[in-house]
């Protein structure tokens, strides 16, 4: 009993000391649940601000991107942004390169968050991101992902066939295997491709295994779309953020009427065509389950409930109605995508309901303003 009291007192004293230093720290329980009869001491952690979120296509990654953009805007952090003025992609299909981004280091500024679409290249990213950067990404069931990709990217218009007919056409599937669609950006094994894998449909098993192991070593957390709320809880604790920081509405989600129901046969054929993605997803889905178990079932359930309550409260405050994206956004004319009509006009609600492209434009403008202020202050000295 006395030993437990000493541990608690030591934690409080440490927290008071670092608080006096003017640094924002927070209490956190350990990530892994403990079976010990003694109470676990509260950990003191500092919120992480240097983050790479590798955005994977059609994996709820736009929802995650909204979280990182909001956090960065709120804390005046610096984003890795494309040099190009006509796309919000950084390269892709070209992998990430320093030459593709706005170089803010020449203004003695440091990059904090990379969350825009790009293809993973760890060596190049390490050259621009701080050493303590946290790397995260998200994966989705490959059959569901490809259905979403085929619909969202209007591949039925390109191939003149719906998804079921396309999968049966070996000539068309071979063509997409040889040459990816939309200027090389989308195709089979999309998640593996986004994460830097260059293998063909039937790559040697060892090359896929080596690729998966390299991603396992490089990333601190791989989230799972089908377990999004639990993923957000693990993300919250990894980054030492608050629940409100990881609240988000679904961004770029399609209306149900635009989704194709997948038969068991179609699921199998899509899995065969996305073999590398199936192995990638299986590995990290199993790893995710272990992380959730280590976190503790009761603890996870309580935190998910807290997150859902917070999301519901923000939705009631911020959203008057759901509308199609073509009504809300100035950038995308999409009738199949859900967007939000704001109720509350606060900045917080504006950012929560903002479309991806509109948010990109806002972030780019704000960062340019920050650079201009910095240059002005230096020249006026």
What are these regions (language model features)?
Residues 60, 65, 69, 147, ...:
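Amphipathic alpha-helical interaction motifs in eukaryotic regulatory proteins
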Residues 60, 141, 277:
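Short, conserved catalytic/metal-binding motifs centered on acidic residues
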């Amino acid at each position: 009993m006395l030993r437990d009291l000493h541990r608690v007192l030591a934690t409080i004293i440490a927290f008071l000391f670092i608080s006096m230093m003017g640094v924002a720290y927070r209490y956190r329980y350990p990530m892994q649940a403990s079976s010990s009869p003694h109470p676990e001491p509260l950990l003191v952690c500092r919120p992480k601000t240097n983050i790479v979120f590798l955005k994977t296509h059609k994996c709820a990654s736009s929802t995650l991107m909204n979280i990182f953009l909001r956090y960065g805007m709120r804390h005046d952090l610096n984003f890795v942004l494309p040099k190009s003025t006509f796309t919000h992609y950084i390269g892709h299909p070209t992998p990430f390169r320093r030459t593709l981004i706005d170089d803010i280091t020449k203004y003695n500024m440091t990059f904090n968050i990379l969350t825009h679409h790009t293809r993973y290249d760890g060596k190049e990213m390490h050259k621009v991101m701080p050493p303590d950067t946290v790397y995260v990404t998200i994966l989705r069931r490959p059959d569901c992902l490809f259905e979403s990709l085929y619909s969202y990217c209007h591949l039925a218009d390109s191939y003149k066939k719906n998804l079921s007919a396309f999968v049966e056409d070996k000539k068309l599937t071979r063509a997409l295997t040889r040459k990816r669609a939309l200027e090389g950006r989308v195709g089979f094994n999309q998640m593996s491709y986004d994460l830097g894998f260059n293998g063909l449909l039937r790559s040697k098993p060892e090359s896929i295994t080596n690729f998966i192991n390299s991603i396992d070593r490089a990333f601190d957390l791989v989230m799972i779309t089908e377990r999004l709320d639990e993923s957000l809880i693990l993300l919250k604790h990894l980054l030492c953020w608050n629940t409100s920081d990881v609240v988000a509405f679904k961004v770029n989600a399609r209306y149900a009427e635009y989704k194709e129901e997948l038969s068991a046969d179609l699921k199998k054929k899509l899995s065969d065509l996305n073999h590398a993605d199936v192995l990638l997803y299986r590995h990290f889905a199993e790893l995710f389950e272990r992380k959730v178990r280590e976190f503790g079932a009761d603890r996870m359930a309580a935190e998910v409930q807290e997150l859902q309550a917070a999301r519901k409260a923000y939705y009631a405050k911020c959203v008057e109605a759901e509308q199609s994206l073509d009504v809300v956004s100035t950038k995308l004319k999409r009738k199949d995508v859900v967007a939000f009509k704001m109720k509350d006009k606060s900045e917080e609600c504006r950012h929560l309901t903002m479309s991806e492209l509109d948010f990109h434009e806002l972030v780019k403008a704000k960062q340019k303003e920050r650079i201009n202020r910095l240059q002005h202050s230096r020249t006026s000295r």
